[in-house]
Amino acid sequence: MPEINLKSSNEEIVNTFFKDITCDDYQESIFKGGQSFADKALNNLDINGYAKKRNNVYPTEKRGSSYLSPYIRHGLLSLKEVWKHVDSFEYQDKTKFRDELLWQEFSRHLYAIVGSQNREFLNFYVQNDPNEVVENDKMNCISTVEQELESTGYMVNQTRMWYSSHQMFRTNQYWLESENYMYKHLVDGSRFAN
């Protein structure tokens, strides 16, 4: 492999050396990688109002998401340090936020126990009535969240849940196809936690 010129732009480096291993065209992420950016995100974390805003999807400025999940998922922030960081916030917000951290911890333990066997006993196929199947391309809400996922690598938790439910129960798509699609694009993708 030829030497990478670190003075080149990120786009030039990715397109020259890594284009064949990516699924999308190059674009700048809404997340900056590395420990210093993870630490900065944690230090700037403000969960005031989190409990009330947690399930907001749109408009984006009303979301309660912490946007820490990529840093947690890739090991730059530990659940323990994030847990401690929110200790001084109001009880309701702190409790709701910590519930989400506990879900991450639970999913890690469950995955450690069952691994990929979850496909065998935790999931099932739903055969929908063909007359009730919804075509995604005719639904603005679906195309909007898919476009956001593909362009940012992120979906807020509430969107992940209703999108997954929609794909499972309102289309004839096998659940694993949707899981693979989301995992392919999510910068914080976790097959068990998501």
Segments predicted by a language model, with ranges:
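Short, well-ordered loop/turn and helix-capping segments at boundaries between secondary-structure elements
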Residues: 88, 169-172, 188
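Short, charged, amphipathic alpha-helices and their helix-cap/turn boundaries
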Residues: 134-138
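Glycine/tryptophan-enriched, flexible segments
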Residues: 1-129, 140, 144
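Contiguous, well-ordered alpha-helical segments that form the cores/surfaces of helical PPI scaffolds
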Residues: 66-69, 105, 130, 140-148, ...
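C-terminal, helix-dominated tail/subdomain
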Residues: 186-194
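Short, solvent-exposed secondary-structure capping/transition elements
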Residues: 110-112, 172-177
